[in-house]
Amino acid sequence: MKIRENIEIFERIKLNKVAKFSDESRGRERLEEPDEIRTCFMVDRDRIIHSKSFRRLKRKTQVFIRTYGDHYRTRLVHTLEVSQVARTIGVALSLNEYLIEAIALGHDLGHAAFAHIGEDILNDFLPGGFKHNEQSVRVAKKIEKNGLGLNLTKEVLDGILNHSGFSNVSKVAGTFEGQVVRFADKIAYVNHDIDDSIRAGILKEEDLPKNIIEILGASGSERIDTLVKDCVFNTIDNIDKGEPRVSLSNEIGDAFIQLRKFLFDNIYLGKYLEDERKKAEFVLSKVIEYYYKNWGEMPELYKNICEEEGIHRGVTDYVAGMTDDYCTNEFNKIYIPKFVMY
């Protein structure tokens, strides 16, 4: 008997009945022979970790653009924190930890440079709009491995696609594991963005709404602990009542929504970042404008996409994959005069 088969048997013994068992995966777009020692979701996790798109997350902004402090979150650090929170919830619920890990690690593969500013600019440029969750799926299916894609399982792709959205009535993933990642993403970014905002000096602990802090906790670790435990216990109640969904309780969920709104009003869309947002918008817009007119200068993969799916699509895929630094360097290379020695 192969090691993988032993793991799959152990899943049957260990995991909750609502978990997604590895040997019941709906498979991949391209048929593959099963691995001898890894389940299909372990294979997906490893492919994501070793992908170029995953490595580039270390140079993509989470909130604060071009921060030079060593402790601000990048998109990669955010991804790792989401994975940790999601796995904690998943293990407590006896779900498939490998599926959770793969979805969490892949959920932001398609995120543009300059945080959500980049997403907004590309959304205006691409006919039909741009959403980072959809782009993450496209990266996994089409862009990675020079156009071959990672050939991930359908469950992982579904979890990546449906990790966005906040309310309990939003479109959700088809697995409990995917639903867990959706909540873990919010739990992670709301709390670590508060931490980074305090570190940047644009927010103080006492600025946080007192009525929310009394419910969720005064520190980041307290809030994460409150939210994780509430998600676990409320989801267990849902399962016991025959309601197969991951959710927060009404009280905790409402407080969390208010805290998230506070961040949007005061940080994400606040005045402190306004000048940096305008600079990022200008840089990204000019890079898009240049490659739209000169798409033949892009790498071969993206030129092929332009020919097959249109210039807007090819330019979007190329620019969406850029890191903050790469995009800025492209802008400088295209528009900034070089010094000439006479």
UniProtKB/Swiss-Prot annotation:
Domain HD, first and last residues per copy: 75-190
CDD domains (UniProt xref): HDc
Region forming the signal peptide: none
InterPro entries: Diverse_Catalytic_Enzymes, dNTPase_2, HD/PDEase_dom, HD_domain, PHydrolase_assoc_dom
Gene3D superfamilies (UniProt xref): Hypothetical protein af1432
Gene Ontology MF term list: triphosphoric monoester hydrolase activity
SUPFAM superfamilies in UniProt: HD-domain/PDEase-like
Pfam families associated with the record: HD, HD_assoc
Keyword terms of this UniProt record: Hydrolase
Family: Belongs to the dGTPase family. Type 2 subfamily.
PANTHER family assigned: BIS(5'-NUCLEOSYL)-TETRAPHOSPHATASE, SYMMETRICAL, SLR1885 PROTEIN
Protein name as catalogued: Deoxyguanosinetriphosphate triphosphohydrolase-like protein
